[in-house]
């Protein structure tokens, strides 16, 4: 799981500023993302279940083509219906114990955490496969984001002895990803670093190899 978190792309139709979600996703897949989470939320998101399912299936097929895990955000029913590789939920989304009861053994389970105590609880649950920690830096992609924690939260979680794979979340881009990895994350998740980039390939190359020239 740790290797799959290296460059974890998150997006929904609301994040796309040019082209379409499938076209941006395929470009990112070609460039080397290691995981994709379909997150359809907020202003500009698809509103009907049928639209979301149709888009999810198109993105899932692209991920399968490039052998990259396809994860759905906060929609257990859809994830189970289409056989997603994983489900990711936040602290205020579907109750994590219900998610575990429905999904454990069928797909990977990811949980967002914002503190050491939440990370410890995720590890105690036993069926959480990885945690998303953040927001590390200020983000424009999530209107209801928690307060920024900085990279210190990653160091604190690792000092607490938590062994779960960690992907950093929030405001991460090719210029600051190395800080996130140095602080203890196994990978970085990005939205706007890819969706708003005019050179997706260069951005992903730098995310995969922090410090490398573009």
From Swiss-Prot:
Superkingdom is: Bacteria
Which residues are recorded as binding Mg(2+)?
A: 74, 93
Cofactor details (free text): Binds 1 Mg(2+) ion per subunit.
Residues holding 2-[(2R,5Z)-2-carboxy-4-methylthiazol-5(2H)-ylidene]ethyl phosphate: 139-141, 171, 191-192
Named in its record, the pathway it takes part in is: Cofactor biosynthesis; thiamine diphosphate biosynthesis; thiamine phosphate from 4-amino-2-methyl-5-diphosphomethylpyrimidine and 4-methyl-5-(2-phosphoethyl)-thiazole: step 1/1
GO terms (BP aspect): thiamine biosynthetic process; thiamine diphosphate biosynthetic process
User: Which cysteine-cysteine pairs are annotated as disulfide bonds in the entry?
Assistant: none
Which GO molecular function entries does the Swiss-Prot or TrEMBL record give?
magnesium ion binding; thiamine-phosphate diphosphorylase activity
Positions annotated to bind 4-amino-2-methyl-5-(diphosphooxymethyl)pyrimidine: 37-41, 73, 112, 142
Top EC category: transferase
Q: Which EC number(s) does UniProt give?
A: 2.5.1.3
Q: Which UniProt keywords apply?
A: Magnesium, Metal-binding, Thiamine biosynthesis, Transferase
What cofactor is needed? Mg(2+)
Cross-referenced Gene3D superfamilies, in alphabetical order?
Aldolase class I (3.20.20.70)
- Give GO cellular component annotations, separated by semicolons: cytoplasm
Q: Which reaction does it catalyse?
A: 2-[(2R,5Z)-2-carboxy-4-methylthiazol-5(2H)-ylidene]ethyl phosphate + 4-amino-2-methyl-5-(diphosphooxymethyl)pyrimidine + 2 H(+) = thiamine phosphate + CO2 + diphosphate; 2-(2-carboxy-4-methylthiazol-5-yl)ethyl phosphate + 4-amino-2-methyl-5-(diphosphooxymethyl)pyrimidine + 2 H(+) = thiamine phosphate + CO2 + diphosphate; 4-methyl-5-(2-phosphooxyethyl)-thiazole + 4-amino-2-methyl-5-(diphosphooxymethyl)pyrimidine + H(+) = thiamine phosphate + diphosphate
Family as reported in the entry's similarity comment? Belongs to the thiamine-phosphate synthase family.
Functional summary from the UniProt entry? Condenses 4-methyl-5-(beta-hydroxyethyl)thiazole monophosphate (THZ-P) and 2-methyl-4-amino-5-hydroxymethyl pyrimidine pyrophosphate (HMP-PP) to form thiamine monophosphate (TMP).
Query: Which named protein is this?
Result: Thiamine-phosphate synthase
Which source organism?
Answer: Listeria innocua serovar 6a (strain ATCC BAA-680 / CLIP 11262)
Q: Tell me the name of the encoding gene.
A: thiE
């Amino acid at each position: 799981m740790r290797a799959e978190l290296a460059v974890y792309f998150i997006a929904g139709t609301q994040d796309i500023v040019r082209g379409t979600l499938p076209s941006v996703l395929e470009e990112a897949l070609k460039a080397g993302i290691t995981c994709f989470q379909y997150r359809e939320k907020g202003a500009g998101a698809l509103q009907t279940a049928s639209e979301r399912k149709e888009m999810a299936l198109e993105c899932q097929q692209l991920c399968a083509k490039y052998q990259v895990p396809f994860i759905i955000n906060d929609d257990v029913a859809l994830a189970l219906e289409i056989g997603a590789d994983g489900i990711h939920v936040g602290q205020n989304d579907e109750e994590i114990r219900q998610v575990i009861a429905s999904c454990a053994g069928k797909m990977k389970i990811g949980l967002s955490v914002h503190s050491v105590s939440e990370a410890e609880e995720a590890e105690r649950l036993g069926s959480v496969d990885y945690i998303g920690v953040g927001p590390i830096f200020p983000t424009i992609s999530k209107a209801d984001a928690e307060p920024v924690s900085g990279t210190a939260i990653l160091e604190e979680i690792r000092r607490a002895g938590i062994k779960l794979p960690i992907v950093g979340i929030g405001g991460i881009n090719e210029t600051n990803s190395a800080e996130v990895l140095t602080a203890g994350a196994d990978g970085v998740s990005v939205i706007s670093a890819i969706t708003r980039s005019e050179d997706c390939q260069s951005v992903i190359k730098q995310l995969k190899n922090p410090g490398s020239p573009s």
